[in-house]
Amino acid sequence: MSDSNPLGALIPNREDMRCCEGDASAEISHAQLDSITDAVRHQYGALAKRAAERASSSTKASDRFYTEEQRYTLTDEAVGASAGCGNPVGIADINLGETVLDLGSGGGIDCFLAAREVGETGYVVGIDMTPEMLDLARTNAEKLQTGNIVFKLGHIESIPQEDNSVDLVISNCVIALSDKKGRVFSEIFRILKPGGRFVISDVVTD
């Protein structure tokens, strides 16, 4: 697990995620998964608050994954709220005029970088389930005077976006936290235009 991600202990192992037989076991399993989702939301909400107060900064991660030029164009709060494990924008080969959607957009760091790549004729959508992160991202957008981004409240397992409407989906160390990864990928394919693509930076394990 990348040391930039504050939620390593919250990712369930295979034993926790096993399919169970019987209603009682299934109910316990669902309760565990609900607890994980709540914990993820709580931890990222706390990270957003610390970043807004500039009491926390993921500079170690941002130094490793983002260039000095990229960091210079962002707010301190956007960098401080980053809990990613890579830089999907750096390898996505984004084109002018494209529509890009970021799953688990957090404080908006990858959205802001993507917005520069798509230009004024393009559009970026950030999806996050944490209200505090959405508030921070929208504040960052105002500070950066970025007009081609919208941030939406939603879950990556049920993306609030129209079918066949996105050229590129990106995600940075978020899908690993979902217990319904198959549904996430189905949603990605649903919203992608024909010939669309997705670029994901994430944690994997055998």
Task: Give the residues covered by each predicted segment.
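A short acidic, Gly/Pro-enriched loop at the edge of an enzyme's catalytic core
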Residues: L96, E157-L168
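Conserved SAM-binding strand-loop segment of SAM-dependent methyltransferases
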Residues: Q145-E157
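Conserved SAM-binding loop
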Residues: A137
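N-terminal auxiliary segments of SAM/dcSAM-dependent transferases
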Residues: S2-R64
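A short SAM/SAH-binding and catalytic strip from SAM-dependent methyltransferases
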Residues: D167-K180
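A short glycine-rich, Lys/Arg-flanked "PGG" loop and its adjoining helix->strand segment in the class I
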Residues: G182-R197
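Conserved SAM/SAH-binding beta-strand->alpha-helix loop
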Residues: T130-E132
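Conserved alpha-helix/loop element of class I SAM-dependent methyltransferases that forms part
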Residues: K60-T99, D110-L113, E117
